[in-house]
């Protein structure tokens, strides 16, 4: 049994004609188990992937107020600097959660204007409906069979 555990696969050497053919064609070897185990490098931390000069959008200035290429580059630099100042990444790589900043209640409702006129009639209607239902139940109850003394005598 112990000899079975010692069995391993040895890859034979590639023939010379295959090596020459692959070299002429430009064949690249696919990933192997060993290459898949290697940890890939993390991508750049910048989320802006269009930093290359040939991948930048074409800037066209039609009017006086339009942005020029230099102004766009300045704005991008300012945005990157602001992002760098806002959230420094922790050295150990852990994510830190923070509670959101609470705003005063005045700011919260400053833009909202709602009237309760629609709500009040609805509440009144609900109350009136419940009164009507109660009166209907009383009417139905009175029309039900009743066992009076007269019925008992017969």
Swiss-Prot record:
The modification Phosphoserine is found at residues 50, 146. Residues 43-56 have a biased composition (Acidic residues). The modification N6-acetyllysine is found at residue 108. Residues 23-63, 79-154 are annotated as: Disordered. Keywords: Acetylation, Phosphoprotein. Signal peptide: none annotated. PANTHER family: GEO02494P1. This is Uncharacterized protein KIAA1143. It comes from Homo sapiens (Human).
């Amino acid at each position: 049994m112990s000899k079975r555990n010692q069995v391993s696969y040895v890859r034979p050497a590639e023939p010379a004609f295959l090596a020459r053919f692959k070299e002429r064609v430009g064949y690249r070897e696919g990933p192997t188990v060993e290459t898949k185990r290697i940890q890939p490098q993390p991508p750049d931390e910048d989320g802006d992937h269009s930093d290359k000069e040939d991948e930048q959008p074409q800037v066209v200035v039609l009017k006086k107020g339009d942005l020029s290429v230099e102004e766009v580059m300045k704005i991008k630099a300012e945005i990157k600097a602001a992002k760098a100042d806002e959230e420094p990444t922790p050295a150990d790589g852990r994510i830190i959660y923070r509670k959101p900043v609470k705003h005063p209640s005045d700011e919260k409702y400053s833009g909202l204007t709602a009237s309760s006129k629609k709500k009040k009639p609805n509440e009144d209607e609900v109350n009136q409906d419940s009164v009507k239902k109660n009166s209907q139940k009383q009417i139905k109850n009175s029309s039900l069979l009743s066992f009076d003394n007269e019925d008992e005598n017969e």
